[in-house]
C-alpha cells in the first residue's frame, strides 16, 4: 500500500514531556507498544509526507534511537523541527488556536473558559470564581498531569501546582463541565498545506483515553450536528484548517488531531479546541480501520 516505514511509539507523549534524548520510557509504556503491535497495521494510509519514516510521533528520544540503529540523520527531523514539535505540543498552543478561531456562535464556547496560570494565586482566583476546575500540566502523557479540584486547592493540589509551575512554567486551568460527547477533527500537515482527514468519536475516563467508536465520518458528523448546526461545524473545520496552516506548514510534517467536546451548561455547548496532538492518535487508527474495512 505504501513504501513508508511506520513506527508505533505510543510512549511519545512521555518522551515529549521529558525532552531528554536519553530518556528511557517506563517499561509499561514500551510494553504497551509491543503488546499492541498489530495496531501499526492501521497507521498506514495514503499521505503526502516527504519522509520515508512515519512514526506515531517525532521526539528527540526516537531520533537518537534511529540514528543509533544506523538511520542517516539527514533523513530525520532537524533539531529545530523537533523543538517546534515539543513547543507546540504544550497545551498553551491549543488555547492559542482556540483564541484565533472566529466562530461567533452562542453554541460554541470561547477560549476564555480556561487560562494559562503562572502563579498559585491565579489558580486559586480562577477556582474561587467558578467553584471547580480542571488543572493540567502543559506537557504530560495521556491521563497524566491532570487534576480535578473543587472549592479550592488541597495541600496535595497546591504542592502539585508549585512543582508543575517550577518545572514547566505554567498550569492550564479550565472550567469543569459535564461532558456529553468527545470527538476530534483529524488532519495531515505537509509541505503544500493542511488536509482535513475526517472525524473521530471517543471516550475518556478521568482524562485518560478509554476507547474509540468505529463509525463513518457522516455518522459522526450527524451526532455532532445534533448539538450544533452543520454550518457552524463547517466554519470550525475551515477555521481550524486555516489557523493551523498559518502556524504549522513549513515547520511540521505529519498527522495531528484536534480534540473537541460537547458539554452541558445551561444548554449544550461545543468546545472546538480541547487538546491538540501533533502526532498520530487513536482516533486516526479508528478512522483508518473503519475506512479500510468499508472501502
State the predicted function of each range:
Residues 120, 127, 138-144, 150-151, ...:
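Extended, Lys/Arg-enriched charged tracts that mediate electrostatic binding to polyanionic substrates
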Residues 7-12, 56-61, 176:
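Structural motif
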Residues 1-47:
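N-terminal "leader" segments that precede or initiate the main folded domain
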Residues 198-251:
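A conserved active-site cap/scaffold subdomain adjacent to cofactor or substrate pockets
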Residues 29-128, 141:
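Conserved N-proximal alpha/beta basic substrate-recognition cap immediately N-terminal to
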Residues 113-114, 132-158, 182-184, 206-224:
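Glycine-rich phosphate-binding loop of ATP-grasp-fold ATP-dependent ligases
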Residues 131, 156-211, 257, 261-273:
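Phosphate-binding site of ATP-dependent enzymes
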Amino acid at each position: 500500500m505504501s513504501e513508508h516505514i511506520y513506527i508505533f511509539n505510543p510512549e511519545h507523549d512521555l518522551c515529549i514531556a521529558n525532552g531528554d534524548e536519553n530518556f528511557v520510557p517506563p517499561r509499561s509504556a514500551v510494553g504497551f507498544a509491543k503488546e499492541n503491535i498489530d495496531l501499526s497495521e492501521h497507521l498506514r494510509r495514503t499521505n503526502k509526507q516527504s519522509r520515508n519514516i512515519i512514526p506515531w510521533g517525532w521526539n528527540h528520544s526516537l531520533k537518537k534511537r534511529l540514528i543509533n540503529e544506523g538511520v542517516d540523520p539527514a533523513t530525520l527531523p532537524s533539531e529545530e523541527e523537533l523543538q517546534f514539535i515539543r513547543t507546540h505540543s504544550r497545551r498553551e498552543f491549543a488555547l492559542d488556536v482556540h483564541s484565533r478561531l472566529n466562530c461567533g456562535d452562542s453554541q460554541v464556547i470561547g477560549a476564555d473558559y480556561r487560562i494559562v496560570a503562572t502563579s498559585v494565586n491565579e489558580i486559586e482566583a480562577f477556582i474561587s470564581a467558578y467553584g471547580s476546575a480542571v488543572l493540567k500540566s502543559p506537557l504530560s502523557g495521556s491521563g497524566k498531569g491532570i487534576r480535578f479540584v473543587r472549592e479550592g486547592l488541597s495541600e496535595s493540589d497546591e504542592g502539585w501546582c508549585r512543582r508543575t509551575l517550577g518545572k514547566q512554567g505554567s498550569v492550564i486551568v479550565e472550567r469543569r463541565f459535564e461532558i456529553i460527547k468527545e470527538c476530534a477533527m483529524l488532519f495531515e500537515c505537509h509541505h503544500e498545506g493542511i488536509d482535513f482527514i475526517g472525524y473521530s468519536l471517543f471516550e475518556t475516563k478521568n482524562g485518560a483515553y478509554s476507547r474509540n467508536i468505529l463509525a463513518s465520518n457522516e455518522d459522526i458528523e450527524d451526532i455532532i450536528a445534533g448539538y450544533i448546526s452543520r454550518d457552524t461545524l463547517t466554519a470550525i473545520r475551515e477555521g481550524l484548517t486555516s489557523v493551523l496552516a498559518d502556524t504549522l506548514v513549513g515547520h511540521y510534517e505529519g498527522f495531528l488531531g484536534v480534540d473537541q467536546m460537547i458539554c452541558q451548561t445551561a444548554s449544550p455547548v461545543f468546545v472546538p479546541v480541547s487538546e491538540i496532538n501533533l502526532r498520530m492518535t487513536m482516533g486516526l487508527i479508528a478512522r483508518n480501520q473503519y475506512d479500510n474495512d468499508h472501502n
